UniProtKB/Swiss-Prot annotation:
EC number of this enzyme: 2.7.11.1
Active site positions: D178
Family stated for the protein in its record: Belongs to the protein kinase superfamily. CK1 Ser/Thr protein kinase family. VRK subfamily.
UniProt function note: Serine/threonine kinase involved in the regulation of key cellular processes including the cell cycle, nuclear condensation, transcription regulation, and DNA damage response. Controls chromatin organization and remodeling by mediating phosphorylation of histone H3 on 'Thr-4' and histone H2AX (H2aXT4ph). It also phosphorylates KAT5 in response to DNA damage, promoting KAT5 association with chromatin and histone acetyltransferase activity. Is involved in the regulation of cell cycle progression of neural progenitors, and is required for proper cortical neuronal migration.
Classification via PROSITE patterns: PROTEIN_KINASE_ATP, PROTEIN_KINASE_DOM, PROTEIN_KINASE_ST
Cellular location(s): Nucleus; Cytoplasm; Nucleus, Cajal body
Record region (Disordered): 343-425
Protein name according to UniProt: Serine/threonine-protein kinase VRK1
Origin species: Danio rerio (Zebrafish)
Length: 425
C-alpha cells in the first residue's frame, strides 16, 4: 500500500486508474435519489478525486458564500466516495443520529449528517455526488497555529467528544480507522462543536452485529496515517474498535506533547510499528519519552492501559474511558464546560520539534470495505488544495514489502525494532 505524502502539495495529480472530476459551473442543479434538487455554488476545494462545491436547496437565487451545505462530486466509477456513502447511508441519516442523541440526552454528536446523494450526467459523463453539512476549519491548522500543542483541558474535552462519536459509529457496526486532527473539523456555526469527517477508510467490522475475527494480511500492512495508525493495522489486520481507541490515544498524546517518539522515522513503517509495540508493552516509558519534563498526565497512562487490554472483538467500556478523562479534568481543577479554548497551551516542555517526514495513506479500491469479508480495501488520495470541510488528501509512491509476524492470538508478540529508517515506504 502506497504511503501518504506530506501536506502542502498544491497541484492535484491522480493515479492512472482514477479520474478527476471536471468542474461544474455555479448554478448547476443536481437531483438526488429522493428527487430533491440541489444547486451548486462555486468549487471551494478538492477532496480525494472529487470536487467540493458550496450548495443549497434549489431556489431561484444564487448560492451565497454562507451556504450551509457542501456537495462532493466524483466520477461514478471512482471508489472513495462510494465507500463513504455506504457509511453515511447506513449510519448517518439525520433521524438515526437524532434518535441516538435523544436517548443519550446529548446536545450534539460530532458525526456529519447524510442529506442526500445521487448521480448526475454532464457532457456524456456520469458523476456520483453526496450532500454534506458545511464545516469550518480543521484541528490540524489550529494545532500548527498554536505551536503544535493544545492545553490539557482542551485535549481531554476533545477526547470526550471523540468517545461520544466512536461509541455511536461503533454501535452502528462501523469503525473509522483514520482519526487525526485534519479529520476533525469545527462546526461552521458553532466553534465549540467538533466533527469527525472522512469515512473513506470506514470499515463495517460487525455486519449484522457479528464482529469479524482477527486475521493478518501481509498485503495490507500499515493502512491509515502512519504516525497514528494502530498496531493491528501495521500487521495488516482489519480495523476494530480497539484500533480506533489506540489511534485516538496517539492523537491525544501528540496534542499534549507536540510529537510522538517515532515521528522522525515515518519513512520506515516497520520502525514505527516496532516502536508502538515497545510502547504498548511499557506504557510508562512511552509517556516518559513523550513528556521530557516529567509532568506526565496520569490519565493518558490509564487510557492507554485500558486500550492495551482490549481484545480484538471486545466492546470497549466507553463510560469507564470517559471517567478516566473526566478525572483528568478534575485533577487540574477543571470540568467539561463544553467550551473549546484553542488559545495558547500551557503544558510543560516536551520533546523537541522536528520536521515531519512524508505520511502514508491506504489506497481505497472501487469495492466498499463493508461489502466483503476480507480486509478493507486500501485507498490512495491525490494531492490537492484544502479549502472547505478539511478536503486535503495526498498520494505517495509504493512501499517495500513487509515481513509477516507470527500470530498466535489477538495480542501479537513484540519484535525488536529494525532501528533504521528507510526511504519512502
Amino acid at each position: 500500500m502506497p504511503p501518504k505524502k506530506a501536506d502542502g502539495v498544491k497541484k492535484a495529480r491522480a493515479p492512472a486508474k482514477r479520474k478527476l472530476a471536471e468542474e461544474f459551473p455555479s448554478g448547476e442543479v443536481l437531483t438526488d435519489n429522493a428527487k430533491k434538487k440541489w444547486k451548486l455554488g462555486s468549487a471551494v476545494g478538492q477532496g480525494g478525486f472529487g470536487l467540493l462545491y458550496l450548495a443549497n436547496e434549489d431556489s431561484s437565487g444564487p448560492v451565497t458564500a454562507d451556504a450551509p451545505y457542501v456537495i462532493k462530486v466524483e466520477p461514478s466509477d471512482n471508489g472513495p466516495l462510494f465507500s463513504e456513502l455506504k457509511f453515511y447511508m447506513r449510519a448517518a441519516k439525520p433521524d438515526l443520529i437524532g434518535a441516538w442523541m435523544k436517548s443519550k440526552k446529548m446536545e450534539y454528536l460530532g458525526v456529519p449528517k447524510y442529506w442526500g446523494s445521487g448521480f448526475h450526467e454532464k457532457n456524456g459523463k456520469r458523476y456520483r455526488f453526496m450532500v454534506m453539512d458545511r464545516f469550518g476549519t480543521d484541528l490540524q491548522k489550529l494545532f500548527e497555529g498554536n505551536g503544535k500543542k493544545f492545553s490539557r483541558k482542551l485535549v481531554l474535552q476533545l477526547g470526550l467528544r471523540l468517545l461520544d462519536i466512536l461509541e455511536y459509529i461503533h454501535d452502528h457496526e462501523y469503525v473509522h480507522a483514520d482519526i487525526k486532527a485534519s479529520n476533525l473539523l469545527l462546526s461552521y456555526t458553532n466553534p465549540n462543536q467538533v466533527f469527525l469527517v472522512d469515512y473513506g477508510l470506514a470499515y463495517r467490522y460487525a455486519p449484522e452485529g457479528v464482529p469479524k475475527e482477527y486475521k493478518e494480511d501481509p498485503k495490507r500492512c500499515h493502512d491509515g496515517t502512519i504516525e497514528f495508525t494502530s498496531i493491528d493495522a501495521h500487521k495488516g489486520v482489519s480495523p476494530s474498535r480497539r484500533a480506533d481507541l489506540e489511534i485516538m490515544g496517539y492523537c491525544m498524546i501528540q496534542w499534549l506533547c507536540s510529537r510522538l517518539p517515532w515521528e522522525d522515522k515515518l519513512q520506515d513503517p516497520l520502525y514505527v510499528r516496532d516502536s508502538k509495540l515497545r510502547c504498548r508493552d511499557n506504557i510508562d516509558e512511552f509517556l516518559k519519552s513523550c513528556f521530557a519534563s516529567g509532568n506526565i498526565p496520569a490519565e493518558m497512562g490509564k487510557f492507554m492501559q485500558e486500550v492495551k487490554v482490549l481484545g480484538y472483538t471486545d466492546r470497549p467500556d466507553y463510560d469507564k474511558l470517559r471517567g478516566i478523562l473526566q478525572q483528568g479534568l478534575k485533577s487540574i481543577g477543571s470540568t467539561d464546560d463544553k467550551k473549546l479554548d484553542f488559545g495558547v497551551a500551557t503544558n510543560s516542555t516536551s520533546l523537541p520539534s522536528v520536521k515531519t517526514p512524508k505520511r502514508k495513506k491506504a489506497e481505497e479500491k472501487g469495492q466498499s470495505a463493508d461489502e466483503t469479508d476480507s480486509t478493507p480495501a486500501k485507498k490512495r488520495r491525490a494531492p490537492q488544495k484544502k479549502e472547505v470541510n478539511g478536503a486535503k488528501k495526498t498520494a505517495s509512491p509504493a512501499k517495500r514489502p513487509v515481513k509477516k509476524e507470527t500470530q498466535a492470538s489477538s495480542e501479537p508478540a513484540v519484535k525488536k525494532s529494525r532501528g533504521r529508517p528507510k526511504k519512502n515506504s
